[in-house]
């Protein structure tokens, strides 16, 4: 990565203005139910504190409609962060202006301040330079550690870098190192597994990867559209009629490039979208009318696992079936297990894939678990992410 990081700065006595991604789920009682993203920022926060900086944190939470909404205040996140840090965590109900400036000025080395939800300000999402300039008054150096928001050109992710020296935090650095190395200089065979419901979300990703990978394994609802492009009957399965021609073109392109594009050879079908539905395992040539494909079958699971076992680099994004319903979780679990058993570099992106890995207790077995859904997809598409482009070059 040719961007400056927090290691390139002398922090003693400086105020670090850090964009983190604390967009975490809360329950009815407003308690954090999954703190993965908060924990992911701790190495950066702790390093800055150890180096003698004071730390001012900015994040969004949820999708407030560009105004204050009580249920999206960051107070529960501040409380949770305090339970994970020895340093005192202060929280204020504002993001910019006199109160924020006074709180930032008063902060001592070794202390933390969490600002209010950046998206309460309508100027955040329009990347208004006036908001970025107001935020810049709060710190000396800007640190972007919010990989999950790096694909958005907002005031706190991109605009701010025009007003302060801008460097990457450890999480941002790790994400770029893992995904960047896999895409630019992978150990081969390089295999990508793409799943999830919609092909339309991932056409750009597949397009970009066809120029890089040795094998592409496809599962989830999107596989149905590819199967339809091969004139397979898919019954009442989810398909994107608008994308069938596109899927056919990608199949041809893979062939032309010598990339192995694998689709399910057998599937788990059900007569309804329900955990209580009648199910059967059938060859892809035998899917009856009125039944829907909800998972890859055992033969496909074995084939995909075999390809993974021979790989040196694997990127997995998206589940193989409707993994939240128990009868259709086996495909996703098989892929997760194959990755855990593999000696390859394994990179997991996308919320559902990550959830499957976490649920099975296999997170420790993976080389890298990406915290950014949309951001990692756009990186896989070969796009330049505004939040990263804005950082100072080395």
UniProtKB/Swiss-Prot annotation:
UniProt entry keywords in alphabetical sequence: ATP-binding, Cytoplasm, Glycolysis, Kinase, Nucleotide-binding, Transferase
Pfam families in UniProt: PGK
Reactions accelerated catalytically: (2R)-3-phosphoglycerate + ATP = (2R)-3-phospho-glyceroyl phosphate + ADP
Signal peptide: none
Molecular function, one GO term: ATP binding
Keyword Kinase: yes
UniProt-listed Enzyme Commission number(s): 2.7.2.3
Subcellular location: Cytoplasm
Transferase keyword on record: yes
A Gene Ontology biological process term: glycolytic process
InterPro entries: Phosphoglycerate_kinase (IPR001576), Phosphoglycerate_kinase_N (IPR015824), Phosphoglycerate_kinase_sf (IPR036043)
Biological pathway: Carbohydrate degradation; glycolysis; pyruvate from D-glyceraldehyde 3-phosphate: step 2/5
Cellular component GO terms held in the UniProt record: cytosol
Residues reported to bind ATP: 202, 324, 350-353
Domain of life: Bacteria
Residues that coordinate or bind substrate: 21-23, 37, 60-63, 119, 152
Annotated PANTHER family: PHOSPHOGLYCERATE KINASE (PTHR11406), PHOSPHOGLYCERATE KINASE 1, CHLOROPLASTIC-RELATED (PTHR11406:SF23)
Family recorded in the similarity comment: Belongs to the phosphoglycerate kinase family.
Subunit description: Monomer.
Name of protein: Phosphoglycerate kinase
Gene: pgk
């Amino acid at each position: 990565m040719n961007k400056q990081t927090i290691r390139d700065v002398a922090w003693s006595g400086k105020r670090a203005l850090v964009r983190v991604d604390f967009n975490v789920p809360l329950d009815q009682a407003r308690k954090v139910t999954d703190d993965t993203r908060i924990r992911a920022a701790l190495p950066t926060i702790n390093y800055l504190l150890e180096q003698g900086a004071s730390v001012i944190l900015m994040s969004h939470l949820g999708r407030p409609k560009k105004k204050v909404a009580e249920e999206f205040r960051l107070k529960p996140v501040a409380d949770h962060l305090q339970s994970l840090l020895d340093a005192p965590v202060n929280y204020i109900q504002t993001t910019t202006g006199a109160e924020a400036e006074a709180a930032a000025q008063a902060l001592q080395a070794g202390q933390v301040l969490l600002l209010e939800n950046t998206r309460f300000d309508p100027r955040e999402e329009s990347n208004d330079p006036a908001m970025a300039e107001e935020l810049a008054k709060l710190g000396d150096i800007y640190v972007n550690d919010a990989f999950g928001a790096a694909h958005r050109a907002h005031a706190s992710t991109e605009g701010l870098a025009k007003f302060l020296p801008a460097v990457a935090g450890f999480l941002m650095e790790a994400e770029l190192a893992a995904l960047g190395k896999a895409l630019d200089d992978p150990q081969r065979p390089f295999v990508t597994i793409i799943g999830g419901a919609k092909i339309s979300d991932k056409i750009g990703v597949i397009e970009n990867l066809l120029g890089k990978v040795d094998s592409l394994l496809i599962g989830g609802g999107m596989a149905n559209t590819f199967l339809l492009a091969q004139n397979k009957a898919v019954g009442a399965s989810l398909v994107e009629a608008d994308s069938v021609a596109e899927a056919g073109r990608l199949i041809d392109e893979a062939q032309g490039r010598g990339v192995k594009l694998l689709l399910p050879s057998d599937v788990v079908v059900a007569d309804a979208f329900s955990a209580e539905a009648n199910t059967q395992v059938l060859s892809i040539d035998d899917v009856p009318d009125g039944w829907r494909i909800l998972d890859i079958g055992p033969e496909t699971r074995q084939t995909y696992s075999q390809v993974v076992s021979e790989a040196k680099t694997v990127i997995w994004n998206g589940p193989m079936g409707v993994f939240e319903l128990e009868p259709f979780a086996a495909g996703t679990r098989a892929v997760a297990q194959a990755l855990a058993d593999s000696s390859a570099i394994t990179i997991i992106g996308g919320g559902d894939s990550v959830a499957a890995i976490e649920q099975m207790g296999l997170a420790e077995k993976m080389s890298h678990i990406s915290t950014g859904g949309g951001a990692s997809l756009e990186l896989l598409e070969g796009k330049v992410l505004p939040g990263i482009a804005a950082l100072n070059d080395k």
